[in-house]
Amino acid sequence: MGEEAGVNGTGPAEGGGDEGEEDEQKQVIQRTTKFLEYDADQHEIEVEMGFEDPSNPPVPGFNLYYMQWRTRRFVEHFVVRLLTAILIVVDMIILFVDLFNPHVKNDPLEYCSLAFSTYFMIEVILRIFGLGPKVFFRAWHNALDCFLVVFTFILSVVTVCLENMPSNPVSLVVALRLVRLVRITRILWERRHLQRGARQFVSQNKRRYQQHGFDLDLTYVMPRVIAMSFPSTGRMSMYRNDIKEVARFMDTQHPGHYRLYNLCSERHYDETLFHGRVERFHIDDHNVPPLTDMLRFSASVQEWMKQDESNIIAVHCKGGKGRTGTMICVFLIDLGVFQDAEHCLGFFGDRRTDKNVANKFQGVETPSQSRYVGYYEKVVVAGRQLPLEIPMIITKITLHGMSTVGAGDGSELRFTLQSRAHTIPFQAHLGMQKNCKVMVERSVGLVHVFLLNAPIIRGDTRIMFFTDSRKIPCGYEKSPFFFWFHTGFITDNILRLERHELDNPHKSKTWNVFQEDFAITVHFETDSMTRAY
């Protein structure tokens, strides 16, 4: 397989490797570094070598491109699309009521219909301006929609004028109402507009690719690296990327030169739509990949990139943020583009975020994922040598800043402890003191948990706390807080994680409970025994 070959044959740590291959690697790094001039303070890149990022948002200001973009964002907003759909339905009802009711001079329903026609006319004009006439009229349904709106608007104006004539021809007015019924057909393709609005609403302020008739939650992180959300089918395609549109994009923009990386453990799709050019890495949502998978991923990408300078990769999880950003940062660190993981994570977040829409950061937010990118930086520095999976036993867990967490004594909490190599987790309950003994220091907000019958852990390990208390907020995994770590990176048999380094308490919405002094300290002792649990 290409993945294994990549692991064994592409790393610069191979010592006496082929000089030509090393030169090629250096050229790739030089080209990439030349493309990026990264400002660590401003978190911006300068585009060089003639590359224009098609997913790059326009520069704010009084310019045509920005005004078109703003107009498009407004007219395709989910609320505007929903309002338009409702007005189409109301307009249909008014047309039927007006048609079957006896003719009345100066009928107020005619004026309502004219008001709706005016709204539809303005809405179509805004869509033409936002998309641009060339792109708008390329789609047959847009052209037909425009014709119907303009045609029925003229009919509405004529009908109102005839209503105000001293001797209005009733039969002609009725005929015009009948003709206006063709506007009902607009409801058929309004579904498309609602889907587009829903996708923009769900993607929030992630950069979208909105060129060449596409509107996808898809970002060029680099010229040959794409981050995107899941290519979806069925109901999910109504608010995420439609898999057929993603396939059309790949086949038209990068024909024969793309490879997809699916990082979702929870869902997959028909690979034949992408001609079988899909590799899969199973990573649970909001969790971290094994360090071995990080190495395999980077080696696979490098092997694919070397085959042809036109080859690109498209990486996705569900939303195209956490797992996607983690693995893309792994590849960028391997290239040597960034000196450290922190700058690499900041770069990905800036590339994925459209600040014209909002300032919400759309990068890797989960602390454990960021921690593992930092681990990978250390692996690369060590010549791609994975750390030893040192057997360890957790002797004590200390919870800091517990005064504002539930009852303050940890009695509402329980937790699981599990290394990746084991399927059955170790469980402990603080309130029942199951597999643990608890000592509380209320005056300083400390809860000490001494583990009993603790198992030996090795390598990737997760500690996840749970609670049934409504006073303690839960987030991902229905857990108030959890975290991943690797035993090979534990120093001095102690691991301390502050609030911002814990998954879920890092979010500001939990800070009324998990205050600034909230932290966890884990105490270990090394054990060379090989018993498992």
Describe the residue ranges of each PLM region:
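Non-transmembrane regulatory loops and terminal regions of cation channels
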Residues: 1-111, 164-193
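Interhelical loop segments of eukaryotic multi-pass membrane proteins
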Residues: 105-112, 137-139, 194-204
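Eukaryotic cytoplasmic intrinsically disordered
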Residues: 185-193, 338, 365, 370
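Cysteine-based protein phosphatase catalytic domain of the PTP/DSP
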Residues: 194-313, 335-363, 396-533
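A phosphate-binding catalytic loop at a beta-strand-loop-alpha-helix junction
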Residues: 310-330
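Catalytic cores of secreted or luminal carbohydrate-active enzymes
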Residues: 357-395
